[in-house]
Amino acid sequence: MNFLAHLHLAHLAESSLSGNLLADFVRGNPEESFPPDVVAGIHMHRRIDVLTDNLPEVREAREWFRRETRRVAPITLDVMWDHFLSRHWSQLSPDFPLQEFICYARKQVMTILPDSPPRFINLNNYLWSEQWLVRYRDMDFIQNVLNGMASRRPRLDALRDSWYDLNAHYTALGTRFWQFYPRMMAQASHKAL
């Protein structure tokens, strides 16, 4: 899962959206640095990552990547799941339009920015103003995201080529998303994540 899915599942679970978004920028035990609700959100994010990586649908999708891109498949798939969520938001969350959800999420996240790591602050400078969560629905933007990550982290250069795997298996990836994501939504609503 990437930014949008973590925020969405956190909302459904009535968990801290701030903590769920912040989690990838926090190493180790967060309990001494953040309030309890944010810590709970960080832990939820980590559980979702482990759960998602071990889903049979996700394990199967990783196998569709070529040998030279399989190492970065988990990262690529996380971004792709956000693509499908953004693209199909109105079906998955018909009572909360995406733009309204984004405003709601941003307000929550802004409350923790003053005490956040610099990299997280930097992310927030772009995430909201450049409308990433809406733009995830566009596959050209997904390609730009993967290229950007590869540029910032040279050891992840294979992300550039992983775009071809997404394109080659687009329909099958969409099918897998619809198989697992509604289940995760139900788990979140029942606070079982």
Curated annotation (Swiss-Prot):
Catalytic activity: holo-[ACP] + H2O = apo-[ACP] + (R)-4'-phosphopantetheine + H(+)
GO biological process terms, semicolon-separated: fatty acid biosynthetic process
InterPro entries found in the cross-reference section: ACP_PD, ACP_phosphodiesterase_gpbac
Protein keywords: Fatty acid biosynthesis, Fatty acid metabolism, Hydrolase, Lipid biosynthesis, Lipid metabolism
Enzyme Commission number(s) of this protein: 3.1.4.14
Any GO MF annotation of the entry: [acyl-carrier-protein] phosphodiesterase activity
Superkingdom assignment: Bacteria
Iron-sulfur as UniProt keyword: no
Enzyme class: hydrolase
Record has Lipid metabolism as a keyword: yes
NCBIfam families, per the entry: PRK10045.1 (NF007466)
Family designation: Belongs to the AcpH family.
Function: Converts holo-ACP to apo-ACP by hydrolytic cleavage of the phosphopantetheine prosthetic group from ACP.
Protein name (record): Acyl carrier protein phosphodiesterase
Organism: Shigella boydii serotype 4 (strain Sb227)
